[in-house]
Structure formats: structure tokens, C-alpha cells
């Protein structure tokens, strides 16, 4: 899993969502601005791409098996950034939860891994990957609604926006992206 793959996936936001909701004459500007921000954010990732990443790690792909949790739907798994799956689980658009609950899961993960990770570096990557992943999801859900006529996915897009807002509001690294999103959306 590399930055080129992450860029390509995040670009689905532009390819489907922006294309549907932004007028043609404004689209070129937003495409340039957001692509620049995606590249900037990807350049700020600090963890190595060196662990198993499920990539679709959310509540719907977890099942209880005896007294353990099993993961299903692993066909998209790759080697990637260690913060990606936690971002997928905590900021899952299919499962609304409070910030307090999200923080509890996040802090529990940090506690379990305190000797293995630098908390500042991990938080940086977690927030970047959450934002990029939710932009990708907005694009995918728009594609499912437009191309495949699966309109049910549209109802999840507002929560994906809330998750993006949650992650970008207090982190200066997102200042330019926030301005762009606020202006156009």
C-alpha cells in the first residue's frame, strides 16, 4: 500500500462526488486544489507501510466467534500503514458513535501498543488516513448511487462529512484542505 494507491483512492471523491455536485466551470479549480492537498497530506505520513492492513476494517466485517473476534472480507488486504485499520474502525460511516467512544477505543489501542508506537506520529497518520479514507468513501458511495443506482449509500455521506470535520477541526495540517472544503462544499 503506497501513496500512489492512497492518492488514486482519495481521488474518487473528485471523480464522483465533486463531478456530481460541483459545476463544471468550478471543477477544474477544485480538482487542482484538492489534488494538491491530498499530495501534501500523503507527504506528511510518517509511519512505514510495513504491516498487514485489512483496508475494509469496520464493524460490518467483524464477527464474534466463540470468545474472539474474527475478521471477514479480506480480499483487499495489503501491506500498509499501521494507523489505517484503526481509522477505518473508529471512523466507520456505518456505525455512528460519540467522540468519547471513539477516544476510548483509540486510547485503548495506544495503551496496548505504547511500547511499539510514537503517539504523536501515530495520531498524525491516523487523522490523515481517516480524512483521506472518508473522502474516498464519499466518492465510492456517490459512485454506487449514480452508476449502480444504490441510493441507500447517499444517506451515509453526511456522517462521512462529520467524520472529516471531526478530524480536521483542531489540526493545523488540514487548514488549507478545510478552507477548500468549506468554500466549495
List where the protein language model places each region:
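Conserved protein kinase catalytic core
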Residues: 62, 79-81
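Active-site activation/catalytic loop segments of kinase-like enzymes and analogous catalytic loops
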Residues: 11-21, 82-117, 131-148, 160-167
